[in-house]
Amino acid sequence: MDSRLLIVNGHPDPSSRRYCAALCDAYAAGVKSRGWKADRLEVGGAATPAILRAQESCDVLLLRNESAIGRICDADRLAIVFPLWLGAAPHALQLLFESVAQAMDPQQSPIAADLVVTMDMPALLYRSQIRTTGKSGAPRNPFYLNGVRADQTTLIGSVNVMARSEREAWLLKAHALAQRAVDRNVAVGRRSILGWRVPFSMPAWFTQAISRREPRIVSGH
């Protein structure tokens, strides 16, 4: 069976004119260049309308998003692209992954993912704010999503004033990021098959705790 990576566009507006949509396209191209299948889930599209109805019960929310939840749980890996809204992921995206966590087996480890986050402010400035709030007792990872283990978080700052050349450069980086993500998964699989590393699944409570810590930010603007 072909390996499958699901790209989640977390922007509430699924328009192809949005920069998040362009980043998803670039990531998908990188995945396909490595021979993997790249599926796409639009949080702001018709596929997940119920996540915008915050007044509904969690049971109804879970039922109506069964298709989206199933696609997330069946993926070998995730890439989640979203804009920073009010200091965190958009509420609709958070609600979707709360439903994912409810649907997962309690003993199942979180799904590995790369996060790509766009924002209006400079990324380095925001990163310094994350560390400051973490020391004051607030949650250390503002990008935490239920059921997800973020292996890598990429911040793209100042998108509202970014030149066209810079935007295109970030699209190339997203393409390369996808290729590295696939290469890492393939390398881990080969080591396990050859016996170089004994497969070991960390307890769910431990991986969830790790996911809540300050994100591992590998690039910023």
Predicted regions and their residues:
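N-terminal beta1-alpha1-beta2 submodule of the flavodoxin-like/Rossmannoid cofactor-binding fold
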Residues: M1-A103, V161, L172-H221
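Short helix-loop-beta junction
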Residues: Y27-G35, R140-R149
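Well-ordered beta-strand positions
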Residues: D76-R77, A112, Q152
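A structural signal for well-ordered alpha-helical scaffolds and beta->alpha junctions
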Residues: N65, L93, R131, K135-S136, ...
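A short small-residue
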Residues: R4-V8, V117-D120, T153-V161
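Short beta-strand elements in bilobed, periplasmic/extracellular small-molecule ligand-binding domains
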Residues: K37-E42, V148-G157
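Short, solvent-exposed loop/turn segments at secondary-structure boundaries
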Residues: R17-Y19, Y126-I130, A163-R167
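Short, glycine-/small-residue-rich phosphate/pyrophosphate-handling segment
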Residues: P106-N146
